[in-house]
């Protein structure tokens, strides 16, 4: 019997511009439809780090060019824009791949809002990298001219960082559940979801943040009662002592083992750390649930237990 699977797809895996994204989504669709062909129900969430940064940069340039005509675009609106154009390409690539294999299954992208706590400490400690990589000189210019917060990102260059509060709940969850139950392939929680918080009455207000897609996918997986959460990354398995002579790749982890390795500092913040933390949270959320961290092209083999790092009780 097939499983209900939530797949967390990284924004970096979608390329840094539109032509790259159109190529990347075709490979993504093939790997996802491999799972659907095996009889699994699949819900896809995705990141938007490079894309939302690109959108905000473009909107900021527009405001600077004609400030009397164009007001600054809120970060929450930029996230919504990224959901639209990434979802558009993903949805069409999935539809095409399904039809190429004679699988009659609808695909739908849900514009998804995710509730956050406006008092989350993350708003005072920005950690989420967005946008393109910069040189040290470019980063210094962004800090001095625009007041951006910038960090060095995993030795690959410098990036802007923004607030990344923990997701609390998914506003459109019932619609997502209904679509899954109706047999649709659903794309949801794009870019971690549009960050919102509740104000007076039933009003939702956008927050200046980008939610981590791994944590949002964990909440999504719990709320759709998934069996498995697959977090895709740039390596086939999780490693301890990564990049060192005594590097060790892990086939499986218990939550307690994962916490031990987290405490020892084996996983980099903003990179593998949130993936492992989200995987542990999901694995502990109910009996029988498991998470898998692996490469996109290894997802099918990972579900079959042939590769990847499995996290389970």
Annotate each PLM feature:
Residues 2-313:
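C-terminal catalytic "cap/lid" subdomain
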